Amino acid sequence: MKEGPISSSSNFNHVPVMGKEIIQSLKELPSELTKQGLIIDATIGGGGHSAQILENFPGIKIIGLDQDPMAREAASKKLIKFGTRIKIISTNFADFSLDEQAICVLADLGVSSHQLDEPSRGFSFRLNGPIDMRMNPKEGSSAAELIETLSEQNLADLIYELGEEKRSRRIARKIKNDLAENGPYSGTQDLSYAIAGCFPPKQRYGRIHPSTRTFQALRIAVNNELGSLESLLLKAPNWLLENGLFMVMSFHSLEDRRVKSSFKTDNRLKVLSKKPIRASPEEIELNPRSKSAKLRISAKKFLT
């Protein structure tokens, strides 16, 4: 599949969700940790959360991770004033290893507003672009290649399991029939139109767009998002000092269920947020994306 143009980082606007809540949680750590501690920002994005942390805690250093080259470029520009207090690494957090210990690991999961708003990335069904959806546009197979290679049965299973889409069988049948009869879709809106046709007319204009769950499923599969999350949940507690915080922000139930279960069953961690922390009504009004966010926080136990 021919790639679309790689967008500039200049428009990479990452609005940090629940920034105040994250800063407040860090302020509740023992002062000896925040005076000179290390934080791992596992999904640095445009650098929004890291900037807030570095501004509020002058002694803290951050290692920021991101597999998206545009995100890293944008974060580098935003955070350049902090000098050696910030180090940005090109990697998926699932592949990261740490030789020292941190006071906090922060992961803001999912797709960023910029990735959704940039047509060339192929994440959005509202803006036409190549059916790509890769977090790293230079690695792996695109969503277009995925739907071409999967069987109808496997595609239906994927849409059902990763998108929780009840019409997965009908959607998969439509996609595979279209590909067989007409060849590849011209772009994301062409695919979205085909998906919407699998719904009754009255359901095509509801609060949730008909393509939402299918596009979510394809994106999760293309980027192995759940596999990467499982790896992070297993590895991150080992990176933490005693009392260090593990904060994970998720945006859909598949992620949140895994985070909740892992925090509850991992004997290295103590759950600090019995229920997920949600964005305030004021924040939701300013940043609608924050409405679906759930922040869970745990702390590293002292293990004898």
From Swiss-Prot:
Organism: Prochlorococcus marinus (strain NATL1A)
Cell compartment(s), UniProt: Cytoplasm
EC number(s) recorded for this UniProt protein: 2.1.1.199
Assigned keywords, A-Z: Cytoplasm, Methyltransferase, rRNA processing, S-adenosyl-L-methionine, Transferase
Gene: rsmH
Primary location group: cytoplasm
GO CC term, one of those recorded: cytoplasm
EC class of the enzyme, as a word: transferase
Protein name: Ribosomal RNA small subunit methyltransferase H
